[in-house]
Amino acid sequence: NNLFAINSDIKREDVDFVLFCTQSPDYFLPTSACLIQEQLGLRTNIGAIDYSLGCSGYVYGLAIAKGLIIGRIAKNVLLLTAETYSKFLHPRDKGNRTIFGDAASASIISTEGFAEIGEFALGTDGKGANNLIVRTGASREKKTKNDLSFDENGNPVSSDYLYMNGAEIFTFTQKNVPVVVKDTLLKNNLEQPEINLFVLHQANKYMLNFLRKKMKIEEEKFYYFLSEVGNTVSSSIPLALCEAKRENRLNGNVLLAGFGVGYSWAGVVLKA
C-alpha cells in the first residue's frame, strides 16, 4: 500500500503479476500471494506465486520478474519480500537474535524505471542445507520435537528453532561471494572499477567488511545498511537500495549479490 501511495505513476490496476518471497508464510496453503492479491485489491486476471528463498531471494525475484517480462507474460511485476525470522528464534538465543531483524519490501519491476536489469549469475549447493535450518514444521518433520537443550555457552539447541553453524556459513560466504561477484561482472562484460556501488546482502558488518577487503573494493563504493534493521534476509538488498536511492547513490552500474541459506547465491548488475 505504501508503494502505491508514494508513487502516483504506479497504479494497482497496472499490476499483472505478484511474486512473493518468504520463508515464513502465514499458511502452508493457500499461497500467500493469492491472499495479497485480495488484500491489495488487485485485479483477478493476474498471476501470483510464492517462492521460498532466503538471503538470495530478492535477486532471484528480479531474475524471475525479468523473465516474465521478456517472455511477455507480464508487463508490471509486483515483487514482494517479507521475512519474520523472529518466529524461528528461541527467546534465549542471544547470538541469532542480535543478528536478524523482521522486514518487508515492495518493488515494481516493469519496462520503465530508474535502472535496467542486466545479466544474472546464479548458484546453488544443497550440501550446505544443514548449516542453516529449521528442521520441524514442514511435511518431513511436521510435529515439534520439544528437544530443547543448551550448549556449553548457554545457547539453546532445538529442532524447533533456527540452527545456524556460523563457522560453516562464514566459510561458504568467503569462498562463494567473490566468485559470484566475478561471475556477475563477466556476465555483464564489466570490470570491477566500472561498478559505482556494490550492494550485497546485509549479513553482518564483520562479514561485509571481510568480503570488501578480500575483493579489494573501495569503502566508498560498498554500501552498508545494518545498524537500524540488522540482517533482514530477502529484504536486506531492497531495503539497502531504497536507502541508497534516498542518498542519491544509485548512479551508473550497481552490483547486487545475495547469498545464504540453501546454500543459494545470485548476482546481477543494475544499470541506472
Identify the function of each model-found stretch:
Residues 3, 15-18, 36, 61, ...:
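Buried hydrophobic positions in well-ordered alpha/beta secondary-structure cores of metabolic enzymes
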Residues 21, 52, 77-83, 109, ...:
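Short beta-strand segments
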Residues 29-31, 89-93, 265-269:
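Short acidic, glycine/serine/threonine-rich loops at helix termini
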Residues 72-104:
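Flexible, glycine-rich active-site loops centered on histidine and acidic residues
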Residues 1-16, 142-196, 207-215, 240, ...:
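Conserved active-site "lid/cap" helical segment
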Residues 93-171, 175, 179, 259, ...:
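Condensing-enzyme catalytic core mediating Claisen C-C bond formation in acyl metabolism
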Residues 24-25, 38, 43-45, 51-73, ...:
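Claisen-condensing/thiolase-fold acyl-transfer catalytic domains that form or cleave C-C bonds
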Residues 27-42, 79-85, 148-154, 207-219:
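Acidic-glycine-rich active-site phosphate/pyrophosphate-binding loop
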